[in-house]
Regions:
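Bilobed "Venus flytrap"/periplasmic-binding protein-like clamshell domains
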Residues: 62-85, 120, 143-211, 227, ...
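N-terminal hydrophobic or amphipathic helices and topogenic motifs
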Residues: 21-102, 285-322
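Periplasmic-binding protein-like
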Residues: 65-66, 140-149, 176-178, 237-311
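A ligand-binding cleft/hinge motif common to bilobed small-molecule-binding domains
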Residues: 119-130, 183, 188-189, 213-216, ...
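Acidic, polar ligand-binding/catalytic clefts
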Residues: 104-163
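Short beta-strand-to-loop elements that line the ligand-binding cleft
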Residues: 91-98, 194-206, 244-247
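Short helices/loops that flank or line small-molecule/ion binding pockets
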Residues: 101-115, 128-129, 162, 207-227
Length: 322
């Protein structure tokens, strides 16, 4: 059960200015690409030691992880963006990123400054792009957690996980934790079902594509994140009575929010302040999308993403940062 995720950088994203990092040969890298140093052992890229390598752009580029049509989230994040502009004193532009590949490319080349990345994409972004995750959403009592669900249509003959043998399961993308890596790992570990041996696989590109593909009868079954499934149902994108969940995994950390490692320290401090003092529950745009979440809390990639890295290791994931 091994596969390789290759990050290939294809060129520029229109309207964004690049400022790529250069190789850092004389420092500890850990699992990071050689462009980045990890002297303190926290598993994320250190800030540059040369002040000339810091960037302090007049306009900050912000994006949200591409789990659905990015246009949906432009208005969702509008109030937060205003808050970010006030605290940083900079104009903030929402970048409608279409894919993880485009997001990682923009991060690595310096054209994206503040963003969120889906659970499974965080290790890719950390190791290959210099992404520094520092926050995630939380309810008053517990951090926002993600689960993998395997869904089928309500009329499907598939009633239990073992019924997936010989069927085709739609996954989202190879970098997705809840949409690919975790389900293929757990299906083999707990049920003896090996991907592309005991069942066939296909990729939809995004969680919303997988969900709507099941609803519309295009896919027999799909592995998706509940943190995408529930908001889509709440927005009445589909009727939840049309589907059934036949499996739900244990919890994983969810979307990680962070910044490019080479942003100026004073700017980083203001970005962190904007997130960690923001009241999600008071935001009329953001709170309906994340109704149980009230705030952002600090995270540690080294500690909080350990379980995700363990799944990657167990499934033989290797990342080629090119």
């Amino acid at each position: 059960m091994r596969f390789r995720v290759k990050l290939i950088l294809l060129g520029c994203v229109a309207g964004l200015n690049a400022s790529p990092a250069v190789a850092q040969p004389d420092c500890p890298h850990g699992a990071l690409d050689t462009r980045y140093c990890d002297r303190d052992g926290d598993m994320v890229a250190d800030a540059p030691t040369d002040a000339k390598q810091f960037i302090d752009p007049d306009t900050l580029i912000f994006s949200y992880t591409p789990i659905e049509d990015p246009a949906v989230y432009a208005s969702v994040w509008e109030n937060f963006i205003t808050r970010l502009e006030i605290l940083t004193g900079k104009k903030v532009k929402f970048f409608q990123v279409q894919s993880n590949a485009a997001q990682f490319e923009a991060l690595r080349s310096g054209r994206l400054h503040v963003t969120s990345t889906n659970t499974g994409g965080v290790p890719v972004a950390v190791n290959c792009t210099g992404f520094v995750p520092f926050a995630m959403m939380s309810s008053p009592d517990t951090p926002y957690a993600s689960h993998t669900e395997i869904i089928v249509t309500n009329q499907s003959e598939i009633r239990a996980v073992q019924d997936l043998r010989g069927r085709t399961i739609a996954f989202t993308s190879p970098t997705s934790n809840s949409g690919y890596k975790t389900p293929i790992y757990l299906l083999e570990k707990d049920f003896g079902l090996k991907v592309d041996v005991d069942y066939k696989s296909t990729f939809s590109g995004k969680h919303d594509n997988s969900i709507l593909g099941v609803v519309n009868g295009d896919y027999e079954a799909a592995a998706v994140a509940d943190v995408v499934l529930a908001p889509m149902a709440a927005r009445k994108v589909f009727d939840p009575a049309q589907i059934r969940s036949i499996y739900r995994s244990g919890s994983f950390p969810t979307t990680g929010y962070g910044y490019a490692h080479n942003l100026a320290p004073a700017l980083v401090a203001k970005i962190r302040q904007a997130f960690l003092t923001y009241q999600i529950a008071a935001d009329a745009n953001l709170s309906p999308e994340f109704p149980a979440q009230t705030k952002f809390i600090p995270i540690s990639y080294k500690q909080d993403w350990q379980v995700v890295r363990q799944v990657d290791a167990a499934t033989g994931v290797k990342y080629d940062c090119k």
